[in-house]
């Protein structure tokens, strides 16, 4: 059962990552958005997830691995591609944005 969802804000010059907790049929924000490459979003997200001791190591690793995949995709090719393509590539991630 999925307990968390990675949320992505897809922009022209940045990509931002946040995590929501799935509660019932909805979600509740767990973290703020962390921006890449403006800041080290991955490291900031890692620290934030580690501070929430009730999140299991497995859940934390899965979220960070998926964040790595999204950041790498955005850096390598995604920043020049429409958000709809990223949504197809990462269907388990919630996307929003202007690009």
UniProtKB/Swiss-Prot annotation:
GO terms for molecular function: structural constituent of ribosome. HAMAP family: Ribosomal_plastid_cS23. The lineage of its organism: Bacteria, Bacillati, Cyanobacteriota, Cyanophyceae, Nostocales. Belongs to the chloroplast-specific ribosomal protein cS23 family. This is Probable small ribosomal subunit protein cS23. Keywords: Ribonucleoprotein, Ribosomal protein. One of its GO terms (cellular component) is ribosome. GO terms for biological process: translation. Pfam families: PSRP-3_Ycf65. Disulfide bonds: none annotated. Part of the 30S ribosomal subunit. InterPro entries: PSRP-3/Ycf65_sf, Ribosomal_PSRP3/Ycf65. The keyword ATP-binding does not apply. Probably a ribosomal protein or a ribosome-associated protein.
């Amino acid at each position: 059962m999925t307990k968390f969802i990675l949320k992505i804000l897809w922009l022209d010059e940045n990509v931002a990552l946040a995590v929501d907790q799935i509660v019932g049929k909805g979600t509740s924000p767990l973290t703020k958005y962390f921006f890449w490459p403006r800041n080290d979003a991955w490291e900031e997200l890692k620290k934030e997830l580690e501070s929430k001791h009730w999140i299991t190591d497995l859940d934390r690793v899965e979220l960070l691995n998926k964040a790595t995949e999204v950041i790498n995709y955005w850096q390598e090719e995604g920043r020049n591609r429409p958000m709809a393509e990223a949504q197809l590539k990462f269907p388990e991630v919630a996307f929003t944005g202007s690009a």
